[in-house]
Amino acid sequence: MVAETGTGLFSAHKITEELASTSLDSGVHLLFDIHDRTFQALPDFLAEHRYQEVNDIRNTVFQKAFDTNLSIYEYLVHHPQLQAHMQDAMKLHQPEGDWLSVFPADEIVGNQQTAPDPARVLFVDIGGGMGQQCIRFRERYPDLAGRVILQDIPQTINRVPKPMPNGIEAVPHSFEDPQPIKSKSPRLDNLARERL
């Protein structure tokens, strides 16, 4: 967990830094404060709904677990600390790999561009939280012409530091509403998480 770099001198290993991060702390809060409670309600919820698919964001296991008619997003508006934990936890490093290393945007987009169009929509991250994937996309492909757009509910977009780096646009939008931005490559960030 720590390395001795000299007599009486120590430094943290990467794992120690990860364990001490705000993102991991927030992830632990989400596990205990939301997920555990939701998982405990899941068997009864599934039985009550005869194990059928549920497509109503206000009729999920979350409502049963928290005894509310609010969607998780509406609920979080009234519980800002939980909302902050959710946004911070979304910044956790994904150990299964980096999607940017397997998605060659420069090749795909570069082959489609005869003349770079800075007004063209390049990337939309739907439900992208604090914009970490948009930022990583722009850092990886700084020379690709086009707009990079972060979409999330207004309560989340209001927490995003402004202005965003590299011209990234933060736009309030619920994925339940029709998509106003047309793009060939939207990214719905971890859809399974959205359907809690």
Curated annotation (Swiss-Prot):
InterPro entries for the chain: SAM-dependent_MTases_sf
EC number: 2.1.1.-
Biased composition (Basic and acidic residues): 186-196
Disulfide bonding pattern of the chain: none
Biotechnology: Diterpenoid pyrones display various biological activities and FDDP C shows anti-cancer and anti-HIV activities. FDDP C also shows inhibitory activity of 42-mer-amyloid beta aggregation that is involved in the pathogenesis of Alzheimer's disease.
Single Gene Ontology MF annotation: methyltransferase activity
Keywords per UniProt: Methyltransferase, Transferase
Highest taxon listed in the record's lineage: Eukaryota
GO biological process: methylation; terpenoid biosynthetic process
Region (Disordered): 166-196
Pathways involved: Secondary metabolite biosynthesis; terpenoid biosynthesis
Chain residues that bind S-adenosyl-L-methionine: G127, G128, D152, S174, F175
Function statement: O-methyltransferase; part of the gene cluster that mediates the biosynthesis of diterpenoid pyrones. The first step of the pathway is the synthesis of the alpha-pyrone moiety by the polyketide synthase dpmpA via condensation of one acetyl-CoA starter unit with 3 malonyl-CoA units and 2 methylations. The alpha-pyrone is then combined with geranylgeranyl pyrophosphate (GGPP) formed by the GGPP synthase dpmpD through the action of the prenyltransferase dpmpC to yield a linear alpha-pyrone diterpenoid.
Similarity remark: Belongs to the class I-like SAM-binding methyltransferase superfamily. Cation-independent O-methyltransferase family.
Protein name per Swiss-Prot or TrEMBL: O-methyltransferase dpmpI
